[in-house]
Every structure is written in C-alpha cells, then in structure tokens.
Amino acid sequence: MYSNKSFQRRQRQQVAESRSEEKFSRSLVRLNAQSLLDSSGNNTTTKNVNSDVVIVVMEGRGSCEGHIGIALHDTCFPEIHLCEFVDSREYTTLKTMINVHEAFDIVIQNGNEERGSTKLLGEALMTAFPEASLQSISSKYFNSERGERQLQSLMNAEVSTVSEGCLRRTLALGALAVLLKYIHETRCVFFRVKSLRIKEMGVNDTCMIDFVSWESLEIVDADDASKARKFQMKQKRTLMSVLNHTVTTNGYRLLRSSVLQPSTDVYLIQSRQEAIEELIGKPQLKDKLRRTLSRAHELDRVIAMCIQTSTSWTVRESEAKINQIIKLMHTLKVIQGIRTLLHSAKMKSNILIEKTEFLKDPRFDQIMNILVEKVDDSLLDGKKNSLHLQNTKCYAIRHFVAVQLDLARQTYEEIIRNVEETGAREIAEYFHGNSSVRLSFSQSRGFHYTFVTRQAESVTIPRYFLDVFRNRTTVTFNSRKVIAYNDRLEQVVAEMFLASDVIVCDMIEEMQPMIPVLYYAMDALSSIDFLCGLATYSDLRDTCKPTFGPSFSISQGRHPILDWDDSEKTITNDTCLTRDRRFGIITGPNMAGKSTYLKQTAQLAIMAQIGCFIPANYASLPIFNRIFSRMGHNDELIRNKSAFASEMSDAAAIVQYADKNSLVVLDELARSTSTEEGIAITYAICEKVLKLQSYTFLATHFLDIAALANYSNAIDNYHFLPQTDENSTKKHKLLRGQYRGPLYGFELVELSTIPDEVIEHAQSLATELRANVEDTERDYDSERRRIKVYMNHRFRECAEYFMDTHGEKWKEEKEAIDKMKALRKYLVDELAKIDSQEQMCQ
C-alpha cells in the first residue's frame, strides 16, 4: 500500500520542501505598538479576529503614490482576492476592506521608514487594528512579474474573474507574490496548478460604508462581528442580526459582506428582488429549501482540501481529509435534493434559474461515481456517539480497496471486542454487575468507565482503578488493562487513517478536472441560502419591494430593528429627498427620535441595495455609492482626540469624498464646542455639502440652522413634536417645517434633582432669548417657492408611478384621480397657511 504513486510523491515533496527559505523568514519583521507608536491607538476593529485570513498590502510610490494594491486569502477558503485602488491618506478604504474580511495577519513593505511612507501606513493599521499581527517585509519580495507568473500558473480560468486589466495592476500582483510566499513559509501550504479561484475585487461596484459607521448606524455589533453565525448568542440588536435567517456559514458570509458593502449593480439588486418575491409566493418551497440546506456541509473546506498540498503528513491531517471526503459525499446528495426541488418548482426568476442550471452540471455525477466506488457512507445515519463517529472515519473506505487497510480493520475490531470483554469482566468482578457502571468511549480519553450516581463525592471506587475524576452526577475512572488497549487502539486507528488517506489522495487526483463545479455549487448554495433568508425576513414583516430612481421617497417607513422587536408599537415616518430638495434639516426635542430616524434612513437604504424588501408601504430610492455618517460624540483619550476633534475629522472626510451619489447623515454636528462656533461651522459644512449635491439629513439643536432654508430651495425643514402622553412617551412623529414649539429641554430638567429656583431662572432667560430670535422676519416668498417646487416634484413622481402601473390611460383611474386631488388640496392649504401667517405678522 505504501508503494503507490501518491505515497511516493508525498515523500519526494517532503524531502524537497524540507529546506526552508531562511532569507524570507528572517526578513519578516513583527511590528508592534512600541516600535511604531509612542502610544497605542483605539481598537476600532472587532475584538475577535480571524487568524486564518492573511492580507498583503503594497503601497504605491512615486507616480503611483496614493495607490494601494492588496492580495487577500482565507486559508480555509479556496479563493484569493486581488484589488488595486486609490485611497486617502487616512487609508479609509483599506481599513474598511480589512474589517469586512476580518483579516488578522497583515503584511506590508519595509525599508522606507526614513521617508515616512511605510511608517504612516504601519501607524494607521496598528492604530486601527491593535490586536492584528502586523508584519513588514523587504520590498524586493513584492515582485509583480513573479506574481503574474504565479497567477497564470495557479488560476483556474473557468471559475476565476480576472480581467486583462488586472495583469497590468503591478501593486496587486506584487502583493500576490508575497502572499503566496507567506502562506508557503508560515502555513506550509502549496496550491495545485490551475486549481485556485482568483477574483478581482472592485471598489466601484459596491457602496462604501466607513467601518466606524457600522456600529454607530447599528449595522453590526463590533464586539460580535467576527463570531460565526452559530456562535452568536445574546447580543445587541443590529441590522445584521435582524436580517440573519441563513442556515449555512457561507450564506451568513454572503449576507454579512452584502450588508457591509451593498451592491450598486441595479440588475443584480432587481434579480434578487425577483427571486425573493418568488420565494415569498412559494412558502412551502422556501421552507423545504432551508431544511435541505441546513443538512449541507460547507464546501469551502472541501475545495481547500482538494486544491492544497502540504509539506507535512500527519495522522491529524489524514483524519481531516477523510472527514471532508465524507462531507463531500453527503453534500452532493443534498445538492441532488435542492436541484430536484428547484426543477420541479419551475422557477421564473433569473438568478434562481441560473443557480439551478449550475446544479445540473454532469460533473456532479462524475464526482459522485468516483466517491461511490471507494467511499462507504452507510454508517452516517447510525448513532451519533463518539465511538460511532470514529467508526465512520475508520470504515469510510470500502472493503477490499486496500489490503493493508483491511488488515488494520481486523486488528481494530479484535481490540474493540477484547476491551468490551475486559470491561464486562471488571465491572462484574469489582461492582458485582451494577448497572450504573458502564464502559464508555470519548475522543479524548478513549475507553473508560463511567459510574452514574447522585452521590459522586461519597461513592467509593476500588483502588484497582486509576485516573478517578468526580463530577456532579458521574465518576469516571479507568484500569491498566483498558489503558493498554487504548494505546494499542490509538496506533491501529492511526494506521487506518494513514492508509485511508492514500486512497483519498488518489480520489482527489482523479477529481481534479471536476473541481470547478464545486466552486459553482458553493456559490449556488450560499446564494440560495442568502435569498431564502431575506425572503424569510420579508415574509415575517409587513414589507414592500423598493424601486430605484432619482428620489429618496419612503411612505410609512419603519425602523428595521424596532419593527422586528415590536411591529405594533413602531412609529412610521415618511422620508422624502429629491434632486431638487436633497437636504433635510431636522429639529426637535431630546429623545424625540431624531437619531433613531437617521439610523432608520441609512438602514433602509442598505436593505434596499442588498435586494431585500423593506418595512414600509412604498419606497423609491437612489443607488448610493457611499454612505457617510457622523453620529456619537465620544472623546478618544488614547489617541489624544477630543469629541470635537473627532467630529471635525469625520466631517473632513465627508466634505472631501461625498458626491451626488452619496447619502450623508449628520447627528448634532459641532455640538461639542461653543454655540457661536458650532452654528458657524455647521453653516459652512452644510453649504459645502449642498454644493456636493449629496442626499443629506442633518439633525441639530441649533434652531438657527433652519434659517438656511430661506437661502436655498434645496433645503427642507422637519421637526419632531415635543408633546408627550401620560407616560412621558414621545410621539416620535416627523412633521414638515421648522420646530416652533416650547422649550423642550426643561421637561427633562424638571425630572432631575436640580433646585426649582435654578430651573425657573433658566426658563425665564431662555424665553427671553427665544423671543429675540422669533423677532427675525420670515421670508414668506421663499416658503411659497419651496412648497411649489416640492409639490411639482410630488405631482411628477405620482404621474410616473401611475403610468408604470396603469399605462397610458392612468389619468382615468380613480386611484390616480383621488391622489392628484389630495396633492392639489395639500398645495392649496399650505399656500393659504403661509398667506395667513404673513397677514398676522403685518
């Protein structure tokens, strides 16, 4: 058995690769906070990092300054991602990508610290990711020509998405050369020729959300962002936790990446919407798909096993391969079930038809035939105890395939019989056949005795037995004879695993031409799980399918997280921003709902761009390329930044990078400084954002900011009412117009322990100041002009909607006539209200 080709090839490979490349290893320099920084920075990344993800960063110099090339690989996932982009000096895009993929090992260039380039990058990454393993390596290893040769050698063209332009991206190719070298030296892993999927990541086909906004907008919880779906227990409600109805790890991974980087491809979004709509209409099919998917194993680790070769050959690795080959066979049966379900349902949505065609590939049957010939999965449906799980792997290869394996099995069975006989004899001799004492088996201890009793602390175990451990209701122990059998059993099991591994390697070699179909299956299963999860959410709540256009219009929208917790008590609010009226200023009381409304706006936009239905009666949104937020006012003491400095840093990024395809939400901008400075800075930033033509919502306590609407028709004023019910609960209802209600802050002050005379004096001063402000003249002509522009857009929007739904004869529809009459009445009433207010002031 040990003279076959696979074994000989492994021996030659071990000898050839035993010579480690010491120069590369010595050139790796571990960077830490002490070597780069005078003081450590805040931890802005997740607390739980993934040590399997490696990212290599190459920064451009000279004429390429500002360009970043990255190569990224998860050693448990059969893909390498390449990307090259232009980034800011704060490395915002790079930090976001590292957070999305939860990379732990980060490798950068060294040798240029004296000029400051690498040091700036190192400081930025160490500050943002203090728990990551940051290392630098000599620039000579960033060889783009070598990276291109390796790409051409390892890439499987059928499943890879690498354009011709990628071959000219020298920074990404240089990073690829170091990545492959690093994986080889630190993980002892090689990739088979023409087996790897290499994907070119684009930064222009996704909506970029700054990773600082992930937690402030309640998209993900930073403390639990890197935990796998099945390990997430009690945690703070986030958009991710509300939408997560996936049943596979890869489905969860696709959902997370989609939420953190929503798509900007309208065709992809609409294809997802069609699939979700179809799945909602077929609830039985959706439930069957989810139940079937829950039985599937993750193909990423199976593919990784098939495309990777290691310089070591251990019993543990052999056992893992046997386990993966069993999972592959089981998953292929699941694929057959999903294929049958989708085919019989006669799906109409393009994305589900495409995935069904992938699953019909004849190469699945070819792989199954290879496995059926040598793999026996008859033990999979038996008992699920530890001994059965070991037997599943020991008997995974069919009988009469390898003589040495069959001989080892005979020895294994003989040892099992002997240890069972010994156990029965010792229990009868020392415990007189007590039924509470039995022979047990575990992976860690092997065979041992278990005494089940409620008096574990006081029960007496004969001195003949060893290794006595007392738990609450059991006592475990062993004997010398059983321990001797365990040692022999461990040796025989190792022989069986190594012998089986040779057969598994032969099957992997035979399956190599069919490996691309496993990539298709992995994508298909994760996509179907992703769509079923979104369909489950959309079906459980009152949602609508959003459309896409130039206006940001939502009718009766609800906060996704609040709606999930208690849909009956959730307050609905409208949202309306257009190209002509693209800036909304929101004023109102404390705790009235301003911040919650801003989060609702951003979350609904994200949900729409991942293809999900959103909690509203009607929604039409633009496609956003970037979403900016400035929320929260915390000092960053470790980085020596005050709350105001942190605010201005975020505002600078917005002013610099926002454009007409951006959504900007600002919560109480410049609150952490004096009133005069705060108003002036807010004015200036608002004027700049207006010129950028971004869709913007600003929540502020500076009532003077609302006067900006007098100078620009692009601004609308909104406010929340201060009135409360008997339980001091705010109404949380957004209304049009500037806030002109009472001095709402004193309602909360009166609930505190501040003396009454202090509160009364403060109220008198505030009333006097308020009266001075209200003496300012209102520009009624501007208000009339704004309401006319706004209603003109509403008329046009309604006409387009009814034309799409009813065709050219939409004007004859009663619904359209009633809607137009209602809009006309609203316009007349608003103009009359302005006229009456003007007459009262004269």
Curated annotation (Swiss-Prot):
Mind listing the UniProt keywords for this protein, alphabetically?
A: ATP-binding, DNA recombination, DNA-binding, Meiosis, Nucleotide-binding, Nucleus
InterPro entries cross-referenced by the UniProt entry: DNA_mismatch_repair_Msh2 (IPR011184), DNA_mismatch_repair_MutS_C (IPR000432), DNA_mismatch_repair_MutS_core (IPR007696), DNA_mismatch_repair_MutS_sf (IPR036187), MutS (IPR045076), MutS_con_dom_sf (IPR036678), P-loop_NTPase (IPR027417)
Effect of mutating G116E? In me15; defective meiotic chromosomal segregation
GO biological process assignments: chiasma assembly; embryo development ending in birth or egg hatching; homologous chromosome segregation; mismatch repair; reciprocal meiotic recombination; resolution of meiotic recombination intermediates
* Compartment list: Nucleus
The entry summarizes the disruption phenotype as follows:
Worms show maternal effect lethality producing 95% inviable progeny from hermaphrodites. A high proportion of those that survive are male. Mutants display severely reduced crossing over, resulting in lack of chiasmata between homologous chromosomes and consequent missegregation.
Positions the record marks as coiled coil are none
Residues of the region (Disordered) are 1-21
**What GO molecular function terms would the record report?**
ATP binding; ATP-dependent DNA damage sensor activity; double-stranded DNA binding; mismatched DNA binding
- Which GO CC annotations does the UniProt entry carry? nucleus
PROSITE patterns (UniProt xref): DNA_MISMATCH_REPAIR_2
Subunit record text: Heterooligomer of him-14 and msh-5.
Task: Report the protein name in the record.
Answer: MutS protein homolog him-14
